């Protein structure tokens, strides 16, 4: 009867669960972290280390977090945690953007606009309460993601202290000469009733009318003469323009030409029976005339744009308004006619060229901009013939104007086109340029543009193309419109002279005095402030500004209002946001930082892509392809979500689907199972008593420590350059190849069959201990919950959380004089592969069942054979085969052959050995197993 030797084996045993059961375990861990004050402990533990500050770009305090939020916060968390392990003090202060239009809209839906049910102060209070509620909801979900930070003391742009610091930041901008006021065309949303910043604009397709309009020359003969032509009697001359905004024609004050463009004087369509010649850019003449129904291009002269400068035209429907021909750099021969109608109240370039020619001083505000904040023509807008424009909305006016121009002779062509057009990012409605009195941070007045472009060069951009992208945006951007005509925000707390409109000469001093009061009572203090308290007798000559600051200024000055305020260094080490923030937070922070300190507020900028489905489509409710982070955490757990984010190439669009999540769940299981196998074999191991020194280890164990050392160097470097996908790939490869397919398989024999305290067994356990200690650190920034769980099961004393530790210091490379070098192991592992290939057909044809049933012969050149023969007795353990013989042969190649063994099988270790039955007390055991049970035990040097 076969004796049961199971009790003599040391099989794996651990209480570390096979299943992660993350949706249940993670919330319990979160509760423990909160209870123990994990973040405060982390800060105390890191005290005195070098600082690494990742400054949080604030999400908007409105609505539930979505997948993009999760990507952003988890990427930040991975970096912060990896910096902790790298020996830094890495504080993380989360923040929220709390002012602005979306919150106003939410309150308006409930209470109506300001003045309906609530006065301005009550309205602001409701906004404050709403934002605070939204922060609480978002904070709960961010914590659930496993993101560690100062959640009890975040920064909020609605906090009185922040609002005060923002006003102090404005004082610095004013002090450095960057603030200006003027009537300039700005992006205007009629639904918001306010100016918009560049970052608040998004582009979408829109169908617009296109019209070609003729501007008749006041002196046709003089125009013809400029072309070297003589005008026949009764022939008129006109300059046609092409536009997609007919509603701007009432504000048309000039026509711009290109100075060096070539123009031709050509025969055009008759004007109500009268012959007419047209001035068109030569490159566009044929195409334009075709639109007007003229097939043949008959040219009467050539001229450069410079020859026509300051000649006068008539407005197409306001005959009394003379229209000068100006020269502008913005005019090209790409499309249209080469002549651009110029309405300085409705376009940046129009404004600049009109200002250059002194045109703005000739007209009143209502002529420059006849459109009010709702998009309606002012009462003073002159009619178009019998057609009343006053009170008409501009989007309706397009068709009305076109209809009214039929039959007047000036409408040469009309059509429609679909094109990309700026829309309000909140309302998704088309916006317009509209000249209004606004406050600006000038890009030129104190060299802000040049200084910002220089500062960009000092920053390390991830990916590298981010540098060219933001530089191009800064180089071409207009002045920053920082004023808004809204209620919920931080006031531009300036006093302006009632007659001159100039800010008070002591503005920076006054701003700081206002800030001190706001810090105590919030922004309402400004609106209730009696100017005489600060200005004394001068109060009668000054008005308080009621505009508020752009929310991008709110978030843009967090480097001052948060970092400096909390004693953290500036510039921050890293800003990390989505790729849209080159025109948003990265840029507003850069401009405010340079305006205040002549330096970028960050050393590094990292951007991530947007989330899309597996087909590359944007996720949306209408497509039904959206995946919410809350759902992932409920079904799979936060660590699966975190693993997907780490494994994705975040520099591009990040694809997610249920299938992708399933693959990441499978990857998680492989990593968890590896950890569990390590822990199972560390049962009964105490590093204080049993740890075998590296130099005394079995060489295979020493090799796996070497491989772990190589991997850790790779992982640490990848964390430092934010390449998390490489880390995940390297970890999975190490677990499946180095450990799963080789080391863990080979060492089972030693771990299970040797005496519990045998050196060979303790050597394997020591190697596994080193690997486990390193492994828990490697995964901690990504799989934070699992790492914390694993940390609690490791042998030895482990206090607190793995993040209190640093990268593991117990690993080391194989020394150059090792009995087996890394190169030796590479050759042996190649030989192992060769053996496996020889055994495969033997298994397939039934010659053997398992590799242990095959005896192996290796024939190699003399030198290689001499190197391997001392290992021959133990090679069977590396190959997990029967006995191995190494012979020398006169060949440069290595030959492997195998034959089924005839030796008996040991029932305990399953090896086929001639010594089975040699001990009558254990007739079914090999001599090695007998020694391991009752004798001194076997010795192992190599494997």
UniProtKB/Swiss-Prot annotation:
It catalyses: tRNA(Ile) + L-isoleucine + ATP = L-isoleucyl-tRNA(Ile) + AMP + diphosphate. It is found in: Cytoplasm. GO terms for biological process: isoleucyl-tRNA aminoacylation. A motif ('HIGH' region) lies at residues 59-69. Binds 1 zinc ion per subunit. ATP binds at residue 621. Its EC number is 6.1.1.5. Its cofactor is Zn(2+). One of its GO terms (cellular component) is cytosol. Zn(2+) binds at residues 906, 909, 926, 929. Pfam families: Anticodon_1, tRNA-synt_1, zf-FPG_IleRS. L-isoleucyl-5'-AMP binds at residue 577. Catalyzes the attachment of isoleucine to tRNA(Ile). As IleRS can inadvertently accommodate and process structurally similar amino acids such as valine, to avoid such errors it has two additional distinct tRNA(Ile)-dependent editing activities. One activity is designated as 'pretransfer' editing and involves the hydrolysis of activated Val-AMP. The other activity is designated 'posttransfer' editing and involves deacylation of mischarged Val-tRNA(Ile). IleRS has two distinct active sites: one for aminoacylation and one for editing. The misactivated valine is translocated from the active site to the editing site, which sterically excludes the correctly activated isoleucine. The single editing site contains two valyl binding pockets, one specific for each substrate (Val-AMP or Val-tRNA(Ile)). Belongs to the class-I aminoacyl-tRNA synthetase family. IleS type 1 subfamily. Monomer. HAMAP family: Ile_tRNA_synth_type1 (MF_02002). This is Isoleucine--tRNA ligase. The gene is ileS.
């Amino acid at each position: 009867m076969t004796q049961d030797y199971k009790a003599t084996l040391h099989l794996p045993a651990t209480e570390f669960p096979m299943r992660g059961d993350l949706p249940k375990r993670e919330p319990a861990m979160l509760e423990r972290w909160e209870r123990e004050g994990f973040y405060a402990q982390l800060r105390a533990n890191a005290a005195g280390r070098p600082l690494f500050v990742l400054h949080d770009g604030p999400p908007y305090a409105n609505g539930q977090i979505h997948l993009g939020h999760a990507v952003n916060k988890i990427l930040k968390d991975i970096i912060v945690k990896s910096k902790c392990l790298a020996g830094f003090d890495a504080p993380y202060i989360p923040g929220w953007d709390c002012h602005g239009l979306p919150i106003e809209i939410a309150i308006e839906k409930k209470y109506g606009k300001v003045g309906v049910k609530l006065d301005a102060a009550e309205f602001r209070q409701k906004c404050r309460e709403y934002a605070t509620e939204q922060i609480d909801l978002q904070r709960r979900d961010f914590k659930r993601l496993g993101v560690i930070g100062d959640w009890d003391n975040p920064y909020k742009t609605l906090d009185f202290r922040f609002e005060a610091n923002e006003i102090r930041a404005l004082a610095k901008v004013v002090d450095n000469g960057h603030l200006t006021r003027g009537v300039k065309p700005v992006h205007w949303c009629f639904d918001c009733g306010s100016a918009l910043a560049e970052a608040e604009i998004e582009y979408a397709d829109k169908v617009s009318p296109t019209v070609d309009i003729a501007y008749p020359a006041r002196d046709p003969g003089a125009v013809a003469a400029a072309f070297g032509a003589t005008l026949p009697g009764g022939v008129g001359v006109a300059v046609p323009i092409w536009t997609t905004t007919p509603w701007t024609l009432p504000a048309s004050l000039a026509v711009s030409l290109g100075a060096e463009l070539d123009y031709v004087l050509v025969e055009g369509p008759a004007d109500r029976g009268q012959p007419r010649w047209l001035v068109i850019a030569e490159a566009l003449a044929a195409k334009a005339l075709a639109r007007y129904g003229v097939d043949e291009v008959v040219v009467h002269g050539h001229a450069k744009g410079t020859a026509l400068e300051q000649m006068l035209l008539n407005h197409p429907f306001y005959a009394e308004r003379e229209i000068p021909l100006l020269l502008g750099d913005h005019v090209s021969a790409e499309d249209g006619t080469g002549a651009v109608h110029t309405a300085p109240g409705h376009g940046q370039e129009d404004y600049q060229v009109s200002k250059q020619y002194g045109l703005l001083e000739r007209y009143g505000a209502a002529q420059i901009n006849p459109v009010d904040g709702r998009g309606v023509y002012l009462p003073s807008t002159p009619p178009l013939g019998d057609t009343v424009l006053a009170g008409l909305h501009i989007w309706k006016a397009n068709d009305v104007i076109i209809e009214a121009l039929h039959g007047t002779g000036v409408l040469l062509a009309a059509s429609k086109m679909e094109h990309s057009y700026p829309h309000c990012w909140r309302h998704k409605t088309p916006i317009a340029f509209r000249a209004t009195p606004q406050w600006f941070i000038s890009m030129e007045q104190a060299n802000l543009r040049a200084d910002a472009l220089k500062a960009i060069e000092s920053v390390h951009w991830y990916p590298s193309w981010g540098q060219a992208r933001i530089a191009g945006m800064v180089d071409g951007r207009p002045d920053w419109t920082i004023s808004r005509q809204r209620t919920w925000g931080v006031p531009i707390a300036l006093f302006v002279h009632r007659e001159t409109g100039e800010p008070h000469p002591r503005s920076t001093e006054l701003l700081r005095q206002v800030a001190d009061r706001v810090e105590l009572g919030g922004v309402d203090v400004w609106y209730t402030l009696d100017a005489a308290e600060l200005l004394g007798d001068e109060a009668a000559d000054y008005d308080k500004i009621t505009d508020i600051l752009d929310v991008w200024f709110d978030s843009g000055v967090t480097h001052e209002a948060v970092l400096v305020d909390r004693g953290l260094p500036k510039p921050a080490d890293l800003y990390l946001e989505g790729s849209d923030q080159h025109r948003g937070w990265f840029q507003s922070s850069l401009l405010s930082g340079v305006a205040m300190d002549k330096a970028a507020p960050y050393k590094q900028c990292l951007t991530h892509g947007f989330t899309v489905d597996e087909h590359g489509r944007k996720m949306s409710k209408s497509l039904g392809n959206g995946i919410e982070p809350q759902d992932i955490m409920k079904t799979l757990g936060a660590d699966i979500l975190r693993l997907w984010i780490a494994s994705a190439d975040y520099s591009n669009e990040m694809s997610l689907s249920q299938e992708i999540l399933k693959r990441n769940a499978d990857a998680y299981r492989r990593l968890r199972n590896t950890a569990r196998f390590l822990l199972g074999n560390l049962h009964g191991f105490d590093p204080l008593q049993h740890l075998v020194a590296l130099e005394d280890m079995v060489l295979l164990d020493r090799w796996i420590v070497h491989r772990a050392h190589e991997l850790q160097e790779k992982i640490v470097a990848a964390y430092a350059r934010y390449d998390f996908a490489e880390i995940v790939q390297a970890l999975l490869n190490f677990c499946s190849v180095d450990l799963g397919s080789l080391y863990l398989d080979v060492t089972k024999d030693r771990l299970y069959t040797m005496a519990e305290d045998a050196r060979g067994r303790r050597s394997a356990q020591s190697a596994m201990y080193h690997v486990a200690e390193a492994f828990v650190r490697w995964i901690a920034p990504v799989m934070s919950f699992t790492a914390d769980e694993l940390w609690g099961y490791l042998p030895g004393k482990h206090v607190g959380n793995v993040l209190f530790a640093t990268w593991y210091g117990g690993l080391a490379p194989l020394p150059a004089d090792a009995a087996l070098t890394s190169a030796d192991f590479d050759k042996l592992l190649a030989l192992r592969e060769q053996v496996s290939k020889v055994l495969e057909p033997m298994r397939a044809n039934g010659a053997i069942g398992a590799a242990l049933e095959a005896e192996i012969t290796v024939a190699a050149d003399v030198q290689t054979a001499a190197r391997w023969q001392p290992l021959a007795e133990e090679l069977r353990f590396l190959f997990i085969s029967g006995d191995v013989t190494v012979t020398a042969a006169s060949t440069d190649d290595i030959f492997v052959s195998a034959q089924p063994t005839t030796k008996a099988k040991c029932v305990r270790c399953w090896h086929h050995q001639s010594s089975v039955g040699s001990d009558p007390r254990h007739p079914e055991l090999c001599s090695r197993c007998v020694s391991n049970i009752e004798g001194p035990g076997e010795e192992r040097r190599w494997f």
